[in-house]
Amino acid sequence: MKKLLLCSLALVMVVLAIAGCGKSTSSSSATTKELTFNGQTYTVPKDPQRIAVLSNSVLSMLYAVDGKAISRASTTDKLAPELEALPALGQTANINMEQLLDLKPDVVLGLVNQHKKYESQLQSNNIPAVLFNYDGIKDNVPMLTFLGELTNHQDKAKSVIATYESNIQKVKDAIKNQQPARIAVLRATGKGVTAETDEAVTASMVKELGMTNVVTSHLDGTTKDKTVPYSLETLTADNPDIIFVVTMGKEEEITKAMKKAMTDNPAWANLKAVQNNRVIYLPSKLFLLNPGLQTPEAMARLVKEAYGIDVTF
């Protein structure tokens, strides 16, 4: 009886060992993994080799973590030679899908607001797509983390994030003893002039730096709009120390819109910022859209304009 019991136990142990081996083999042979970005989970290749990128803002982040791509979007901006050499698939909002499919990507990276329209076509071709809701500077660190995990370069991503956060802290430390400047951020386009809320790129950096955006006093605190109507009458009442102007569109159309809404009115000349020559036009490359890895440089530019303090990295 004792011998039978020992044999039974031995048999059970063998079965468990075989089962354990089978489970280990199954796990190690998995070809996909699940990654999360801002609460959204994506199934992607375990070790992607052909990453197609439809947005150059995502592309720069991918290469920052030592990732590689097989495509980019067309642009007039100057790119690093390695990025310039990649096949261009057309403008960000108008991708050539035939060309993309011919590249045979194993995963596609794009933006929800630009590339959602291509999602069903990618699905029908069994190509996983990661469409990011990548918008404000708050998304930069999560994006780097995600791309580090996607490419299996987690350590590189952590290093890039550490430098990025250290540089931002350096900018903040440079003005920690300054009286917060009162700022208005105007968005000037060919259609008119509005004011930025904290949801917009430049105003969010103003907030991060501890400056006061005078526009927020007119909001209920729940708005998700990036810009809101803002009259010269309200601007005159707020009378900020500095007016930052972020432009979008053709220069002559913007000038015309600014004259109509603001500068042709005699009240404009009475503004403190105008009288002190503190109306500052900011380059759209850094201040209209998320500047990504250049966020510390953009914030340093705001500090230079607001306080006259140089911050170098």
List the model feature ranges, each with a label.
Residues 36-38, 87-98, 220-231:
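Short helix-initiation/N-cap motifs at beta->coil->alpha
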Residues 53-103, 107, 112, 214:
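A short, structured surface patch at a secondary-structure boundary
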Residues 97-110, 127, 232-245:
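Proline-aspartate-enriched helix->loop->beta-strand connector
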Residues 79-82, 114, 118-150, 280:
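Flexible loop/hinge segments that line or gate small-molecule binding clefts
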Residues 3-8, 19-57, 156-186, 247, ...:
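Bacterial Sec-exported substrate-binding components of ABC uptake systems
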Residues 141, 149, 242-313:
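Structured C-terminal subdomain patch of bacterial secreted/periplasmic proteins
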Residues 75-79, 194-226:
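Alpha-helical, coiled-coil/dimerization segments enriched in small aliphatic residues
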